[in-house]
C-alpha cells in the first residue's frame, strides 16, 4: 500500500499584536478560507474585549472555528485542541476549502504537530483536595511541596502560580512520577496528523520596540472599549474565580486584581501591558525554535502582502 503525500496546511503564527488577523482576512478575500483559531483565550465565551476576539464583521469574511466554544468556568486542553483541529482540518478540506490555522498559543501548535505526552486527565476530586490544602496552607507552601517531589517543575514556576502548581502535584499524585520526567519522555506517536503537513508562517518583529508600542496601544484601546466593564460582568456571574484558567488570561487577572482593590487603575494598566509583553517574549521564543518556519517581518509596512506571498507559495 502506498502512502498518500500529506496535504499542506498553512499556519499563520505570531505573537500578540503582530497583525495575524489582518493577514488572515486578506487571504480570505482571495481564497475560500476557513480559519481555525490557535488561541487558548478565544475559546471562551463572554470574553471578547480582553482577548481581542475577531469582530462579527471580521468573522463574516470567513468561517472561524474554535472561538466561543466553552464557558469561562470550563477548561480546554491541548489534547482537545489537537482532536478538534484534526477533525476540522479534514472537514474543511472535504468541503473543497482551505483550512488556515491562525494564532499564538504555541503549546496548542506543539501538541498538534508533535503529539501529546502521556499525562493523566484532570481529577476533580483530587483537585478539590489540593484546593482545600492550598486554602489552608497557601500556594507558596504547595510550591514547596512540589519542590520536594518535582524540583525541575517547581524551579520554573512562581510560588503563586496556582494553576500550574496544582497540575504538577496532581500529575505526581496520580502517576507517582514527576511531571518533568513525563514531559521529557518521547511524545506518544499516532497517525492522526499523518495526512497533513502543517507549515508555520511566522510574523516576527525586526524591531521588538515597534511590537511593544503596538501592545501598549492595543491594551489602552481595550480599556477604552470597556474591558473593565467586561470583567465586572464576569465577576457578577458569581461562579468565576481568579484561579480559573479563563481568568488567568493576560489582562483579565490584572483587571480582576484592580477590581479587588489590590492595585490602582494606573498600576493595573502598566501590569497588563507588562504581562502582554512577557507573553509576546515567550511566544517569540517558541517561534524561533521552529527552524522550519517561514518568517515575515511584522514591522514591514507590507507585512500582509508578504504573508500572502508566503502562504500562496505553499498552495
UniProtKB/Swiss-Prot annotation:
GO terms for molecular function: ATP binding; tRNA dimethylallyltransferase activity. InterPro entries: Dimethylallyltransferase, IPT, P-loop_NTPase. GO terms for biological process: tRNA modification. Keywords: ATP-binding, Magnesium, Nucleotide-binding, Transferase, tRNA processing. Its cofactor is Mg(2+). The keyword Lipid biosynthesis does not apply. ATP binds at residues 14-21. NCBIfam families: miaA. Monomer. PANTHER family: TRNA DIMETHYLALLYLTRANSFERASE (PTHR11088:SF60). Catalyzes the transfer of a dimethylallyl group onto the adenine at position 37 in tRNAs that read codons beginning with uridine, leading to the formation of N6-(dimethylallyl)adenosine (i(6)A). This is tRNA dimethylallyltransferase. It comes from Paraburkholderia xenovorans (strain LB400). The gene is miaA.
